Amino acid sequence: DGTSMLMSLFYSFYGSGVWANERESNLLDGAAHFYDTYECKDGKYIAVACIEDKFYKEMLDKLEITDEKFSKQFSKDIWPELKSKLGEKFLSKNRDEWAMIFKNSDACITPILDLDEAPKHEHNKSRSTFTERDGVVQPNPSPRFSETPLEIKSSPKKIGEDNILISEKYNINL
């Protein structure tokens, strides 16, 4: 139920005719050159989400893009061409180089981190987004409430760790 609720915006778009039921043909599903992920020189990825004009302009400035076609941000007919050009641009540097270029920027461009990198990222460390319990790194509970402290009560079980307990409870022969 909760997952379908997360789709409310998209069903609203679809119902009003501004969302096509085809993958990568819409503003927020990878069709737009300014809202997608791009591979970098090192095979890692960067996320781009520059919808608003000021963020889009900052992206172009930081990327040193002066091509006049990019001024037509919402012209869907040229999105594939602009996406290709951005793809080439992002392939010119490693992900972490791009992350440094956009670090203190409002351009809405961020590195895509893997499961090992995410807990070590300075933003996540400063927000205490992750914790380690019994040698297992995991996200801290969210949202956080000022008067209701949240805690992780146990670590994830290892595969098969509770097979005997479950099989006895449900009278299953292993």
Language model feature labels by segment:
Residues D1-C50:
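Active-site-adjacent "lid/gating" segments in soluble enzymes
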Residues G2-S4, I78, E117-H121:
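Beta-rich nucleic-acid/ligand-interaction surfaces
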Residues Y14-E24, H121-R133:
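Short, surface-exposed loop/helix-turn segments at secondary-structure junctions
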Residues F34-S105, I109:
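Aromatic-enriched alpha-helical interface/lid elements that frame and gate functional surfaces
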Residues K103-K125:
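Conserved PLP cofactor-binding pocket of PLP-dependent enzymes
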Residues T129-L174:
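Flexible, small-/acidic-enriched active-site or ligand-binding loops
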